[in-house]
């Protein structure tokens, strides 16, 4: 299954080198970042799940960039809110 997935995923991304980068980035998000898979896990490793997500058009480099920017903005807003709450508590 992985071989077919790789061929289909290459068609979605454009070339195998970019595919490796996008799949590794997404797999790392799931493995280290605690992100949930967008497809059923089916007892697959994160790299295979990432390839399946790419194959289905759920993930590409632009989507990953947008999601990371949104998460960063949310984190910055939460940090600002926490700092504001601390500053107001000291008054």
Curated annotation (Swiss-Prot):
It holds the Pfam family RNA_pol_Rpb6. Keywords: DNA-directed RNA polymerase, Nucleotidyltransferase, Transcription, Transferase. The keyword Repeat does not apply. It catalyses: RNA(n) + a ribonucleoside 5'-triphosphate = RNA(n+1) + diphosphate. One of its GO terms (molecular function) is bacterial-type RNA polymerase core enzyme binding. Its EC number is 2.7.7.6. The keyword Nucleotidyltransferase applies. GO terms for biological process: bacterial-type flagellum assembly; bacterial-type flagellum-dependent cell motility; cell motility; cellular response to cell envelope stress; DNA-templated transcription initiation; intracellular iron ion homeostasis; nitrate assimilation; protein-containing complex assembly. It is an enzyme of class 2 (transferase). SUPFAM superfamilies: RPB6/omega subunit-like (SSF63562). It comes from the Bacteria. One of its GO terms (cellular component) is cytosol. Belongs to the RNA polymerase subunit omega family. The RNAP catalytic core consists of 2 alpha, 1 beta, 1 beta' and 1 omega subunit. When a sigma factor is associated with the core the holoenzyme is formed, which can initiate transcription. The rRNA transcription and antitermination complex (rrnTAC) consists of RNAP, NusA, NusB, NusE (rpsJ), NusG, SubB, ribosomal protein S4, DNA and precursor rRNA; S4 is more flexible than other subunits. Promotes RNA polymerase (RNAP) assembly. Latches the N- and C-terminal regions of the beta' subunit thereby facilitating its interaction with the beta and alpha subunits. PANTHER family: DNA-DIRECTED RNA POLYMERASE SUBUNIT OMEGA. This is DNA-directed RNA polymerase subunit omega. It comes from Escherichia coli (strain K12). The lineage of its organism: Bacteria, Pseudomonadati, Pseudomonadota, Gammaproteobacteria, Enterobacterales. The gene is rpoZ.
């Amino acid at each position: 299954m992985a071989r077919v997935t790789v061929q289909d995923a290459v068609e979605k991304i454009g070339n195998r080198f970019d595919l490796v980068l996008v799949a590794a980035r997404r797999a790392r998000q799931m493995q280290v970042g605690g992100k949930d898979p967008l497809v059923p896990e089916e007892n697959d490793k994160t790299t295979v799940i990432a390839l399946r997500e790419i194959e289905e058009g759920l993930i590409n480099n632009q989507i990953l960039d947008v999601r990371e920017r949104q998460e960063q903005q949310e984190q910055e807003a939460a940090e600002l809110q926490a700092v504001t709450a601390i500053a107001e508590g000291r008054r």
